[in-house]
Amino acid sequence: MAADLEFYFDPVCPWAWITSRWVTNVQQLRNYDVSWRFISLKMINAERGYAGNNAYELIHNAGLAGLRVASAARAQGGNASVAALYTALGNAIHVGGRREELVNNPHAFLLSVVDDAGLPAEIASAFEDSTHDEVIRYETEVALSRTGKDVGTPILTFNPKAANEASLFGPVISKAPTGDEAVKLWDAVQTIAESGVAEIKRSLRAAPQFD
């Protein structure tokens, strides 16, 4: 049975993290299932190139390392393990400000995060296992086939596999709403996605707020 929403994430993207917390906030208020899927900023930007921006490339490499561990988590424990790992990754990277640890010492960082998620320690070693790249690349390509290639993360697909399946990039929000505000945004975004709107955008945004 298909989930009600597919959420495509790269763990190093702060905007995807905030959007994911909004999604989990609404999940507590509405009865729906989320399938946590992979999209790699490293793979997206490999085609575009980094033009000498080594900092971004290092961060995106770290994101791919995290996705490999998430793939190993899924292989062992399914979607629930991916959800637990992504929560632990986001809390460490974004809320805890530990992104540089992931970049500079990925194995030690991921061992710590896997432990926080309550998952088997051995999956942390998957960070350098490129055999996981096949599924990560496949899911990245699926996500981009639904939205077009000129986007990043997150990508959301409402009602996957259904006749009214609808995908979009975003929403990009600076702070995750809660309660009624979270539900209002959910209904608005789903309506826009299902209506066939291609783009609504402004480039001005506030800094991400993780509290």
Regions found by a protein language model. Name each.
Residues 22-24, 99-211:
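C-terminal cap of thioredoxin/glutaredoxin-like
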Residues 6-8, 37, 157:
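Solvent-exposed beta-strand sheet faces enriched in polar/charged residues
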Residues 3, 86-89, 154:
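Residue-level recognition of the N-termini of beta-strands and the immediately preceding loop/turn
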Residues 1, 30-32, 164:
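Residue-level signal for beta-strand positions within conserved beta-sheet cores that form or flank
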Residues 1-23:
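Local sequence-structure signature of Cys/Sec-based thiol-disulfide redox active-site neighborhoods
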Residues 17-106, 110, 188-192, 196-204:
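Structural alpha/beta surface segment adjacent to cysteine/selenocysteine redox centers
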